[in-house]
A protein has these predicted regions:
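Conserved cytochrome P450 K-helix/beta-meander segment immediately N-terminal to the heme-binding cysteine loop
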Residues: 100, 379-406
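Cytochrome P450 proximal C-terminal region
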Residues: 2-5, 12-18, 35, 67, ...
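Cytochrome P450 heme-thiolate "Cys pocket" and heme-binding signature region
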Residues: 134, 285, 327-330, 367, ...
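Conserved, non-catalytic sequence blocks in retroelement Pol enzymes and Pol-derived host proteins
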Residues: 33-35, 137-143, 245-248, 330-337, ...
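Conserved cytochrome P450 K-helix E-x-x-R motif and the immediately C-terminal K′/meander segment
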Residues: 50-71, 231, 235, 326-367, ...
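N-terminal membrane-proximal hinge/A-helix region immediately C-terminal to the signal-anchor transmembrane segment
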Residues: 2-114, 118-123, 127, 142, ...
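Cytochrome P450 catalytic-core helices
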Residues: 289-312, 427-443
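Cytochrome P450 heme-thiolate monooxygenase catalytic core
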Residues: 103-113, 120, 143-294, 310, ...
Length: 482
């Protein structure tokens, strides 16, 4: 076969193989009562339309259109895999409590992150989830308060004080990274943290890339950064292990030491490599979600002067009970009730997570439909947040709707998941957010440089310009002890 004739043949083969696979899938599951819907064009399916909706911030409408057409359960094809879309409170309860649905990540994320809680199931998942919940439970978070307080103050002094304008999104991402690096890895200011910061940014950018390991591609750069991060973290973990064996540290000092202590007690059997992988997931999750929340809180306050004033009053009331430069405590954070209601309304109206992917590890039935083993589930968990059946006037920004959270129907407000799948880092994120806002609102007023700036989802909400703001320094009153 000549070169000239082989090229059309290869193109024809490339077109036919996906079509044949598509036909095989249809025949294989002909006896199943599959949900309504269409798998779309082979391989591509509805992937492009979903990505376009995320990028244009019309994902909610994209999902609503499918629900109106097919109902709250429908089949489609996303990222090359047959997929079932689930939405609504009943779906939230079903997905969060179903052990036969495990998290699915892209091939790029699996290669970059490794063997973590995102890819485990069964007994291993229970062990890791239990350990993470233990490390991030409120009693433990109280022990990290001083580190958080120090990191926030240092960050503001270095990056905000003396500046007339700042771009919020990248600064807040770095703040979230520094806090987690200090608390999780025990790494304060220094060259190790700086090296990790640069590599981590590269790795995060590669998580949604095409997983083709060719030099100079985004994925290749991310993979190399991931290897360097692992090398550094493995050494940190071994140093922590040595310090623990010599009695120089305790389980509350950092995540590595905590996990090593649990392993010595037989609570889990994770290797150092496994612990490193889960530490990377903790870093990525906290880095993204907390930074999104703080960024959009700052954006909200620029647009809502009345809310800004109420938050400032609450934070000044807390400051009155403290001495000069006295760090915040858990009790202080617990008193920031109005500030957290505003944060919850941000999470409702601009949810960091629109939806997530899971894989059925066995045949599952939901509402009379079959979800075959190996199929993906795209769980549009936050679509209930903007549903008028559960939230009156859902487009209106109104923190008072959280005055009595018991009035919100179960599984309708799920920014941190729910049931057995509740995010273990929700208290950590809450504390980090409130500490940051305490010091920001007491020291500054701000306004948006571009009032028309929108945001897109890549896949998390991100201001198009990074949220540049003009700063006005405010001298907070000084109080002694009340």
């Amino acid at each position: 076969m000549s070169m000239d004739s082989s090229i059309p043949f290869a193109l024809l083969l490339a077109l036919l193989i996906p079509i044949l696979l598509h036909v095989v899938i249809r025949r294989k599951y002909s006896s199943y009562n599959l949900p309504p819907g269409s798998l779309g064009f082979p391989v591509i399916g509805q992937t492009i339309s979903l990505l376009r909706a995320l990028h244009s911030n019309t994902d909610y409408q994209w999902c609503q259109d499918r629900i109106e057409k097919y109902g709250a359960v429908s089949k489609m094809s996303l990222f090359g895999s047959p997929t079932v879309l689930l939405a609504g409170p009943a779906a939230n309860h079903f997905v969060f409590s179903n052990q036969d649905l495990i998290f699915t990540e892209t091939k790029a994320i699996n290669a970059l992150v490794g063997r973590s809680i995102l890819t485990l199931s069964g007994e291993e998942l229970k062990q890791v989830r239990g350990a993470l919940h233990g490390y991030l439970r409120p009693e433990m978070v109280t022990k990290y308060m001083r580190k958080m307080d120090e990191e926030v103050r240092r960050h503001i002094d270095l990056n905000w004080v003396g500046h007339k304008t700042v771009t919020v999104a990248p600064l807040v991402r770095r703040l979230a990274f520094d806090i987690i690096c200090s608390v999780i890895f025990g790494q304060g200011v220094g060259p190790i943290r700086e090296a990790l910061a640069a590599d981590f940014e590269t790795m995060v950018k590669a998580m949604l890339s095409i997983p083709v390991n060719i030099p100079f591609t985004k994925f290749n750069k991310g993979l190399n950064a991931s290897r360097r991060i692992r090398k550094v973290l493995r050494q940190i973990a071994r140093d922590m292990e040595g310090a623990l064996q010599q009695g120089y540290s305790s389980s509350a000092d950092d995540f590595f030491t905590y996990m090593l202590v649990l392993r010595s007690k037989g609570t889990h059997s994770l290797t150092v490599e496994d612990i490193v992988d889960n530490a990377i997931v903790l870093l990525a999750a906290g880095y993204e979600t907390s930074s999104v929340l703080i960024t959009f809180l700052i954006r909200c306050l620029a647009n809502e002067p009345d809310i800004f004033g109420k938050i400032t009053d609450e934070q000044e009331e807390i400051a009155r009970s403290k001495g000069p430069n006295e760090p915040l405590t858990w009790d202080d954070v617990s008193r920031m009730k109005y500030t957290w209601k505003v944060a919850l309304e941000i999470l409702r109206t601009i949810s960091p997570i629109f939806g997530s992917f899971r894989t059925a590890i066995k045949d599952i039935e939901y509402r009379g439909y079959h979800i075959p083993k190996g199929w993906q589930v795209f769980h549009a968990q936050s679509i209930t947040h903007l549903d008028g059946k559960f939230f009156n006037d859902p487009i209106k920004f109104d923190p008072t709707r959280f005055d009595n959270q018991s009035l919100i129907p179960p599984y309708c407000f799920v920014p941190f998941g729910g049931g057995p799948s509740m995010c273990p880092g929700n208290e950590f994120a809450r504390t980090e957010t409130l500490v940051a806002m305490h010091y920001l609102v007491r020291q500054f007023r701000w306004k948006l440089c571009c009032e028309e700036e929108g945001y897109r989802k890549d896949p998390l909400p991100t201001p198009v310009l990074g949220l540049p703001i003009e700063l006005e320094t405010r001298t907070p009153p000084e109080y002694g002890h009340a």
